[in-house]
Design a protein with these regions (language model features):
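Gly/Ser/Thr-rich phosphate-binding loop
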Residues: 124-127, 146-154, 163-226, 239, ...
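Short beta-strand->loop structural element characteristic of the AMP-binding/adenylate-forming
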Residues: 2, 53-56, 128-134, 204
């Protein structure tokens, strides 16, 4: 484990990236020109064909996804779900968290959800990132309690398995402010189950694609509860077009 751009004390067995650079031969790490539309990652995705293809994600798209996730105001962008007028000021949907931000990524980091939609925003926020070696709901509940996880974003089956696990009733999950994710539709019944199970937290969902560097639409809290089958409105930097079977 390497610490980057921090003066804080690091855990035993970890080091600092600056120390690694200091030991390197300057000629080994040449200066590289990087453009905003250069590739930053290649994620292999099966899409709808079932055969993995390497999707090339750019710096511009990945940074835009971070800002979409961090700056999107659901109270404004999801207003029509409850018929709220533009000038209305909705009441807060959740109480401020008493815990520092801690994101759990139960899906692999080679997937756009975990990397671009969890790791990147968590890094920008300076939040804790909690990883799992493999998915096991009992172990995940243990980590949620121990690490005081505030946001869990996985596939819907993961949320359902957590709520159905016998340890849900005995583990302290009061730190959870948000629970949901993407990768598949968040079923309406699960939306209401999450809303009823969390102690002050809210369900969340979204739709995205690897090729768009992350999310396309997002929905959460009272607006998702009001329209649990909705994936939400578009994020600020994307456009959508509806096309019927005749291409219209």
């Amino acid at each position: 484990i390497l610490g980057v751009r921090t003066d804080r004390a690091l855990p035993a067995g970890s080091g600092r990236w600056a120390d690694v650079l200091a030991m390197a031969d300057p000629g080994v790490l040449p200066t590289v020109e990087i453009g905003t539309d250069d590739d930053v990652t290649i994620f292999y995705t099966s899409g709808t064909t079932g055969f993995p293809k390497g999707a090339q994600l750019t710096h511009r798209g990945s940074v835009a996804n971070i800002f979409n996730m961090l700056t999107m105001t659901m109270a404004a962008n999801s207003a029509e779900a409850k018929g709220i007028a533009a000038g209305d000021i909705p009441a807060p949907t959740t109480a401020p968290s008493a815990y520092p931000a801690a994101f759990m990524a139960p899906t692999p980091l080679f997937h756009v959800t975990a990397c671009n939609c969890i790791l990147h925003p968590a890094t920008v926020m300076g939040a804790k990132l909690v990883l799992t070696y493999k998915w096991e709901p009992g172990r995940a509940l243990e980590l949620i309690e121990r690490e005081r996880v505030t946001t869990l974003s996985g596939v819907p089956t993961m949320s359902r398995e957590l709520l159905l696990h016998p340890d849900w009733e005995t583990r302290d999950t009061s730190s959870l402010q948000g629970m949901g994710g993407g990768g598949a539709p968040l079923q309406p019944d699960l939306v209401h189950k999450i809303a009823g199970a969390l102690k002050g937290g809210q369900p969340s969902t979204g739709y995205g694609m690897t090729e768009t560097c992350g999310i396309i639409t997002a929905n959460s809290a009272r607006w998702l509860i009001a329209k649990p089958a909705s994936c939400g409105p578009l994020v600020p930097t994307l456009e959508a077009k509806f096309v019927d079977e005749d291409g219209n």
